[in-house]
Amino acid sequence: MDRHEHFKAPANEDELDDIDDDMVVGVIAEIEQEVLNESESDDDEYDLVDMGAPEPQQADGHSSSNESISSDGSFDPNAEDSDSDDSMIDEAASGGASSAKRRKEQTATDGVGASGSGASGGADYSHLDDDDETDETVRAIIAAIKKPRSAPPEIKLEDFITDICFHPDRDIIALATIIGDVHLYEYGNEENKLLRTIEVHAKACRDVEFTEDGRSLITCSKDKCVMVTDMETEKLKKLYETAHDDAINKLHVLDERLFATGDDAGTVKLWDFRTKDAIFELKEVEDQITQMLTNEQNKLLLATSADGYLTTYNIGARKLYVQSEPYEEELNCMGIYRGSSKLVAGTSKGRLYTYNWGYFGYHCDMYPGIKSPISLMIPITDRIACVAGEDGNIRACHIAPYRNLGVVGQHNMPIESLDINCSGELLASSSHNNDVRFWNVKYFEDFGDIKYNEKHNAYKEKRHNLPSSKCTNASDFFADMTKDQDDDDNDGGNDTAAGPSNVT
């Protein structure tokens, strides 16, 4: 290592005495000159300017690039360094704030908010281009963002949602709440718009239905009243005050003139819009009526109850038609399938019971189901049903023969209500989390019929996620890997040097 000539090792101790103060002064002067040259270099000057520091002024007596060097060239170790860490950080921060302000102004000019969504239908992601990205993950995220929605976004309310119902003709959905209000939303794939909120009941509105022409809303409540309200004017058209002696739980519209109600004590009543009082009433069970329905002929009215009975009423004769044997579980829901030849009922133990139409005394077939309570059922096609309950999953199943087709959608909490729109393409569900989610189920149109002797894996079917589900299947990931491997193998197969064949 080269040494400065003033610091060469002395030959003996006498040479140390020969070093005088002039030599020390000379060394200090050289160090001062080196520091001064470095501080005045062009590179350091540009670096400081780029970091936001003020440009050094000319030698006019007001300032210098390094205040630690005095005007006479002497070095003052106690002088304050103008380029200290604190000053540099403050100036860099001010420069960064200016850059952030410019970015914010540019974002406002482009019209894209920080939230990425709004009443106008959401943010504009057209400027994103996945072709410019090399990272596969980033490209996948951009592609998912730009992918058009196939179902409306989620609706979130502050109050508990007790029931939902689609309009028979328009893209409108009614949401009944626990405080007695009904919210009407116009839904679309890009946004949902609140049309109006109708205050109908003093207590919880338990069920809401549209009339067949879609002009009026029928609601029942815990306050024992039934109300018919004009959907457009919000005016009350008819009030059935104290329609039942107990809280009303279910409604069912038969046609343009008739509708039925069922209460918590098991009483069923049939009403005519043109009259003030009920046409008839029957009490054949002692517990809550959970669901009511009829077929197209409207000759029989069926009702399930929480005490395990399927009760059938003859509408024309206004009397009991038949009542099933009691079940040791609640019958919560039902649907008609196979050309109105089969009735399927769901239970609190997750079972599905099948009845031949007209023979409702006892079931002809039973499917173990999903081992989780089934509280809701909606027919999607003549052979496919969607069921939901306390586990928060909406599952599709094939009727006669029974097969689990997979999971249609999910909620984080138990599902409270389920309905399908007039076109049969959109399914809506509400949960205990005060939310309504939409699921596009149009893909069921392409499902083929299932044969009785067809082999299947019940374990995989129960956990399989359908296209509308927010979850993906692990097998889909490995299927893509297999596909890529097959493509590579096919490319290599065309090369004679790819390797020896395994064929013997």
From Swiss-Prot:
Domain of life: Eukaryota
Cross-referenced Pfam families: WDR55
PROSITE patterns per the UniProt record, alphabetical: WD_REPEATS_1, WD_REPEATS_2, WD_REPEATS_REGION
Bias kind Low complexity: ranges: 63-74
Region (Disordered): 1-21, 33-132, 477-504
Cross-referenced PANTHER family: WD REPEAT-CONTAINING PROTEIN 55
Name the record gives this protein: WD repeat-containing protein 55 homolog
Similarity section: Belongs to the WD repeat WDR55 family.
Keywords, alphabetical: Repeat, WD repeat
InterPro entries documented for this protein: WD40/YVTN_repeat-like_dom_sf, WD40_repeat_CS, WD40_repeat_dom_sf, WD40_rpt, WDR55_POC1
